[in-house]
């Protein structure tokens, strides 16, 4: 081992000149520098920043006296002079000073005590980091040795492997004999240790995580991103990729054989016939061979025909289906993609938003029976041929509403594009099927081709209205030969398994003669038409149809009243039994929800007469007056054919229901406004499909009356008390007059014209006529009538919102409560609200008067605004005290004083006053004053007030339609409307921003019962049906208190409106609703 010669001089010449930079002086006392033997500068420059080559730490011997080690810019650690001397550093170098044997005292107290230089943690860190690196050790005699640094001892003895003496001039590599395996240099001999090309940061400068590697642009040594080449797949078939034909990856067998034979003399024994593996059959023409062949074929047939073989093969092949088809493939059976018909979607879940979007396109949805949840029955497509079954021709355009002949006047036929019929099966007796009303909603077009008059499929599909709620079958009574809307439209909602009927051509059905019952053959044919129905369903439907045909009878009512009460809405599944019944077959729809005739068509329609005359204006005697939403005049006796009404439930309902003393006799020639009294509230909150609840959407220009149809089927809204009506479906409503509308499809925003099935003079709004004819409704008419708030088309995008006013905390209004006809005010471009404040006809005091007022909110349409407040206040309107007002003969539509929101002026206290201004309740007894306050406050219970903000409403219709008529007050949704005396919370009010009153009030309501909406003024209004069952003097409110009301409300499927606190005068309360 080479020993460096002892030092002759106190300091080495190689040491740099002294510098002030880093002095690591060991205090005389023998203690180490405060930082552990390292001068201050080192702390900040532990590793030189320069390139790795520049950082080459060197170690020098540490004098026993305590010299330090310095690390220079070149990484040199030089031995330091004895203690008296300062240890200098070359310029720019950091010094690492450490005294041998010193304890730094740096470590935590509990750490073990190391000997010697091991206590200098920083120096030890650097030295261990360079283990394995090449180092040059310079000893005191000036010789330099090169080797690989291996380790060091606590006394700073350096062990170096593969050491050889480094020549002054590089003369190639060292010779083998000059290399010493290991040398230990004592600290006393070492002057300088130099490590070259050391990178202290190599372990920390890069990240080795997957993400760091993936982010590194240098992937697999490539610095640029790989350019993707387009894959040219060639033919989709895989013939080109057969392994046998692809020789690109190897030798052709023949080439190999040839190569081996030529180069190695090896001849292949390969035989393509593989004779060594198989026994070739030698075919010959001998008789014996042929007999063997025949015998083999016979055996094969026997084997293949044996049950065991077949069973085994069937198990393997499973009817020709592969494993993938059996276990993983998505099977889509049914009609083609083009048809959204129910049938094609049998069994498939369709998300609600999609159902809503597609409903108008004609996708038929069965109403689902689950939970009474309204199913959307698909509306007939807007286009003539959207229904799968509907005939594509123009002829198909004529659709009878509710299967009624489509001949009705355009007015009656006002298409309701947006309306969706929902049927909630839950209410139906299990036997019943509910069919969403035919696209009453869908536009009705006069039948262009006779063929479109296919008889409407029968009631089988026709859903019966839930008990107690009359389904406004067709808003207008339409002679419906088959009471059923297209079966396709309706689905059978009865408890019986829901069967969606495929929509049959609605038009076809409707065009058939209204009164005539479908013959069984026809029924079968229709059923057969429905695509995608399973046989089971078809059988079920046929059964239902036959049963219906056999059992369907018009039930004459001794008086219109009787007819109304006796028939639960359900009853109306009329399928006119025979042509003789055609007349009867026309059902009057009691849109108001007179439960009895819910499906009945207007009596007038019932006659075999052609359905409504095409002209909106003409009112054929045959045609019933356009049914006002409330109109369902009591159906003429016999009008209502309870189709297979469940006798039990019907009887029950009949017992429960009371006749409407105010009902007028039905005169087919007169337009008739039937009073719909919801005999019972529909049991299920779910929207009904029966009525064709169509909401006409009027185009902006048109002023629409509410169409007779209500949007009764709107999916119910499930509301928690806090919930706002979430589900309003926005339907565009147009204001066009019914007569006007029938002719064209509604403009984009408008719904197909609603039909006023009853023929009423074109001029009179159907509601008015109906109201006049029917007299005040006893009970809220169709439970469905729900308000449909729509916004003028202007704000199509906005959801209509109804917000409850805070003022009426106690009573949320429930859509269900509003049973009165929903008045749809459509707003055209101008939202003029025509509110007929006039109370909807109020029957005598004994009858509850419907209270709902509709205030339009017209904002921004100053000119129209006036209507809201007709200047003429009608005293009658003022709800004074509890005196019920009998219907006013023709209260002006706006009865309120200009300043005030119109209140229904029934004598009864109604909570639903709506003041355009702030809703401050004033006792109903107070006449509405210009003051902002509404009389509502006087009600014993606060009624929830809802304001609809016009702008907010995007033609939305709340689902109130579903709301059963059940008066909320009744604890049970199903409960029949309370009889007079029962308190109902009347409630709906719409607030609209106060409008300037300057405008003339728009059209007075000819009949008090129905608010007249001037056809001309289009305005969007949310209408809220009035609960008609209310009795004057009744305290609004549910028997059970607010919670019960809410619960009831939910049961009723109504929309619960919370209260809006602190509305300022002029503020709109918005009705909130969602799909």
Swiss-Prot record:
Name of this protein: Ataxin-2-like protein
PTM annotation (Phosphothreonine): residues: 632
GO biological process: mRNA metabolic process; stress granule assembly
Residue spans of biased composition, Polar residues class: 330-342, 421-433, 874-898
Composition bias, Basic and acidic residues: 316-328, 505-516, 571-584
Similarity comment text for this entry: Belongs to the ataxin-2 family.
UniProt gene name: ATXN2L
Modified residues (N-acetylmethionine): 1
Organism: Homo sapiens (Human)
Stretches for region Disordered: 1-115, 316-521, 551-697, 733-770, 820-849, 865-940, 1022-1045
Tissue: Expressed at high levels in thymus, lymph node, spleen, fetal kidney and adult testis. Constitutively associated with MPL and EPOR in hematopoietic cells.
Molecular function GO terms recorded: cadherin binding; mRNA binding; RNA binding
Functional note: Involved in the regulation of stress granule and P-body formation.
Modification comment: Thrombopoietin triggers the phosphorylation on tyrosine residues in a way that is dependent on MPL C-terminal domain.
Membrane topology of the entry: Peripheral membrane protein
Assembly and interaction partners: Interacts with MPL/TPOR and EPOR and dissociates after ligand stimulation. Interacts with DDX6, G3BP1, and ATXN2. Interacts with PRMT1. Interacts with CIC and ATXN1.
Positions of post-translational N6-acetyllysine modification: 207
InterPro entries, A to Z: ATXN2-like, LsmAD_domain, PAM2_motif, Sm, SM_dom_ATX
SMART domains: LsmAD
């Amino acid at each position: 081992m080479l020993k460096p010669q002892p030092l002759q001089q106190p300091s080495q010449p190689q040491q740099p000149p002294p510098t002030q930079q880093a002095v690591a002086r060991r205090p005389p006392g023998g203690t180490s520098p405060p930082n552990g033997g390292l001068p201050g500068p080192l702390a900040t420059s532990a590793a030189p920043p320069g390139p790795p080559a520049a950082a080459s730490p060197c170690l020098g011997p540490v004098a026993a006296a305590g010299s330090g080690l310095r690390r220079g810019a070149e990484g040199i650690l030089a031995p330091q002079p004895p203690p008296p001397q300062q240890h200098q550093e070359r310029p720019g170098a950091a010094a690492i000073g450490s005294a041998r044997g010193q304890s730094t005292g740096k470590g935590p107290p509990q750490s073990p005590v190391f000997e010697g230089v091991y206590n200098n943690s920083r120096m030890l860190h650097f030295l261990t980091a360079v283990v394995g690196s090449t180092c040059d050790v310079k000893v005191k005699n000036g010789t330099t040795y090169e080797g690989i640094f291996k380790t060091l001892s606590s006394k700073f003895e350096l062990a170096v492997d593969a050491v050889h003496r480094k020549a002054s001039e590089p003369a190639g590599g060292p010779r083998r004999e000059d290399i010493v395996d290991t040398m230990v240099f004592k600290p006393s001999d070492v002057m300088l240790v130099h490590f070259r090309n050391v990178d202290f940061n190599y372990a920390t400068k890069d990240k080795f995580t997957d993400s760091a590697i993936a982010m590194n642009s240098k992937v697999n040594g490539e610095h640029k991103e790989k350019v993707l080449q387009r894959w040219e797949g060639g033919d989709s078939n895989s013939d080109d990729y057969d392994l046998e034909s692809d020789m690109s990856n190897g030798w052709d067998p023949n080439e190999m054989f040839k190569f081996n034979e030529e180069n190695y003399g090896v001849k292949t024994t390969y035989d393509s016939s593989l004779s060594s593996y198989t026994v070739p059959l030698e075919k010959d023409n001998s008789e014996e061979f042929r007999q063997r062949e025949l015998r083999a074929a016979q055996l094969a047939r026997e084997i293949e025909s044996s049950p065991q073989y077949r069973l085994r093969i069937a198990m393997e092949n499973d009817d020709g289906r592969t494993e993938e088809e059996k276990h993983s493939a998505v099977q889509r059976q049914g009609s083609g993609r083009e048809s959204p018909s129910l049938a094609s979607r049998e069994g498939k879940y369709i998300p609600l938003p999609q159902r809503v979007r597609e409903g108008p396109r004609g996708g038929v949805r069965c109403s689902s029976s689950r939970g009474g949840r309204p199913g959307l029955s698909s509306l007939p497509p807007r286009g003539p041929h959207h229904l799968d079954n509907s005939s594509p021709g123009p002829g198909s355009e004529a659709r009878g509403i509710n299967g009624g002949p489509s001949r009705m006047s355009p007015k009656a036929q006002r298409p309701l594009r947006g309306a969706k019929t929902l049927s909630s099966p839950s209410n139906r007796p299990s036997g019943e099927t509910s069919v969403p009303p035919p696209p009453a909603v869908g536009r009705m077009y006069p039948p262009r081709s006779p063929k479109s008059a296919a008889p409407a499929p029968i009631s089988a599909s026709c859903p019966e209205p839930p008990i107690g709620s009359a389904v406004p079958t067709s808003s207008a009574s339409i002679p419906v030969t088959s009471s059923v809307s297209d079966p396709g439209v309706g689905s059978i909602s009865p408890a019986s398994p829901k069967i969606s009927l495929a929509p049959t051509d609605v038009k076809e059905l409707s065009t058939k003669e209204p009164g005539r019952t479908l013959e069984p053959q026809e029924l079968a044919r229709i059923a057969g038409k429905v695509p995608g129905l399973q046989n089971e369903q078809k059988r079920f439907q046929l059964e239902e149809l036959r049963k219906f045909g056999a059992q369907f009878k018009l039930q004459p009512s001794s008086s219109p009243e009787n007819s109304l009460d006796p028939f639960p809405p359900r009853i109306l599944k009329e399928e006119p039994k025979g042509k003789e019944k055609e007349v009867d077959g026309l059902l009057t729809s009691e849109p108001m929800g007179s439960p009895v005739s819910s499906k009945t068509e207007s009596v007038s329609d019932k006659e075999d007469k052609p359905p409504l005359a095409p002209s909106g204006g003409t009112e054929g005697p045959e045609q019933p007056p356009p049914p006002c939403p409330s109109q369902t005049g009591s159906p003429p006796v016999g009008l209502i054919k309870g189709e297979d009404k469940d006798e039990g439930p019907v009887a029950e309902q009949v017992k429960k229901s009371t006749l409407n003393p105010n009902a007028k006799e039905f005169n087919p020639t007169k337009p008739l406004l039937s009073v719909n009294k919801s005999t019972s509230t529909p049991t299920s909150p779910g929207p009904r499909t029966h009525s064709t609840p169509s909401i006409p959407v009027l185009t902006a220009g048109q002023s629409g009356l509410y169409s007779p149809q209500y949007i009764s089927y709107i999916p119910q809204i499930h509301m928690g008390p806090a919930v706002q009506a979430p589900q309003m479906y926005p339907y565009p409503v147009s204001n066009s007059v019914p007569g006007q509308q029938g002719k064209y499809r509604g403009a984009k925003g408008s719904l197909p014209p609603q039909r006023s099935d009853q023929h009423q003079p074109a001029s009179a709004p159907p509601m008015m006529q109906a109201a006049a004819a029917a007299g005040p409704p006893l009970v809220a008419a169709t439970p469905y009538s729900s308000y449909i708030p729509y916004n003028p088309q202007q704000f199509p995008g906005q959801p209509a919102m109804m917000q409850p006013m805070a003022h009426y905390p106690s009573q949320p209004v429930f859509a269900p409560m509003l049973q009165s006809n929903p008045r749809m005010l459509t707003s055209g471009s101008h939202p003029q609200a025509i509110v007929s404040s006039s109370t909807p006809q109020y029957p005598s005091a004994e009858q509850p008067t419907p209270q709902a007022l509709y205030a339009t909110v017209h904002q921004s349409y100053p000119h129209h605004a006036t209507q809201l407040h007709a200047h003429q206040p009608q005293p009658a309107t003022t709800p004074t005290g509890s005196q019920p007002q009998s219907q006013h003969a023709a209260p002006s539509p706006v009865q309120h004083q200009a300043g005030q929101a119109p209140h229904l002026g029934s004598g009864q206290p109604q909570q639903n006053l709506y003041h355009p201004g702030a809703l401050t309740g004033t006792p109903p007894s107070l006449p509405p004053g210009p003051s902002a306050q509404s009389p509502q406050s006087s009600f014993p219970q606060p009624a929830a007030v809802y304001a609809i903000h016009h702008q907010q409403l995007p033609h939305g219709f709340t689902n109130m339609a579903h709301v059963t008529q059940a008066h909320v007050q009744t604890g049970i949704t199903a409960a029949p409307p309370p009889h007079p005396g029962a308190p109902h919370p009347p409630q709906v009010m719409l607030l609209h921003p106060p409008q300037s009153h300057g405008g003339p009030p728009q059209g007075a309501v000819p009949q008090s019962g129905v608010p007249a909406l001037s056809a001309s003024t289009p305005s969007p209004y949310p209408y809220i049906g009035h609960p008609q069952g209310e009795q004057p003097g009744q305290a609004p409110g549910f028997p059970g208190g607010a919670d019960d009301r809410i619960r009831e409300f939910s049961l009723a499927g109504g929309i619960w409106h919370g209260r809006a606190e602190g509305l300022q005068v002029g503020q709109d309360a918005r009705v909130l609703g969602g799909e």
